[in-house]
């Protein structure tokens, strides 16, 4: 069948390549393989052609994180720029990533802990790099958050931070930080002028600092 041909019963021959089955979760296409969730939802397999056996193979790529996938896989997505990464959300709200470079035999999984539970993940093209967007339920409030794709471009101590749901505020001699309604009643970590300060509880959408600062980041722990 050519690329511009029409599919008919007489010109298509579909052969069974695997008896494992798959979940109704969008498969991911990489440069050399297809990634799919096996029926049952607790394993991710490659679907790739093996020239040695002249047949399709479906090896498991999640052997080392089976304990994290017991609740099942809810969604997955892929970024390719600057590095190829597979993103996975589980039914119990975990966010996992996998540095995936099949040609170099690299399959490296990591967990990204955060307060609340992650419900979904999606990726989009960005100007500097592919963007990762997630839906997070934090204490009964759902919000859409984006991973900072330019985080590793900022290595200055004063502007670097490793925080979730963060709000950055700049000014001269700041003592009252507002706009923290999404952190109401929660313990907020404070990173000001390159130093970690004592945590505070968000009240009426704001926190008060003991000492003035020029750059402040607050985050839900």
What do these predicted regions represent?
Residues 1-47:
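Carboxylate/His-rich catalytic cores and anion/metal-binding grooves
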Residues 14, 19-22, 41-221:
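Beta-sheet repeat architectures centered on beta-propellers
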């Amino acid at each position: 069948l050519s690329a511009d041909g029409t599919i008919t019963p007489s010109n298509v021959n579909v052969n069974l390549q695997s008896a494992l089955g798959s979940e109704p979760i969008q498969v991911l296409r990489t440069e050399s393989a297809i990634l799919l969730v096996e029926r049952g939802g607790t394993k991710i397999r490659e679907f790739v052609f093996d020239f040695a056996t002249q047949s399709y193979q479906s090896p498991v790529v999640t052997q080392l994180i089976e304990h994290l996938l017991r609740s099942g896989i809810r969604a997955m997505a892929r970024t390719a720029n600057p590095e190829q990464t597979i993103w996975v959300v589980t039914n119990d709200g975990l966010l996992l990533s996998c540095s995936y470079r099949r040609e170099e035999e690299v399959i490296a999984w990591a967990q990204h802990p955060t307060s609340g539970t992650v419900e979904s993940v999606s990726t989009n093209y960005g100007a500097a790099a592919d963007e990762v967007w997630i839906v997070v339920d934090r204490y009964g409030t759902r919000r859409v958050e984006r991973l900072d794709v330019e985080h590793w471009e900022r290595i200055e101590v004063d502007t670097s931070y490793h925080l979730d749901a963060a709000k950055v505020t700049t000014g001269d001699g700041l003592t009252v930080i507002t706009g923290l309604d999404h952190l109401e009643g929660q313990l907020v970590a404070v990173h000001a002028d390159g130093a970690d300060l004592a945590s505070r509880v968000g009240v009426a959408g704001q926190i008060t600092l003991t000492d003035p600062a020029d750059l402040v980041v607050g985050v839900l722990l």
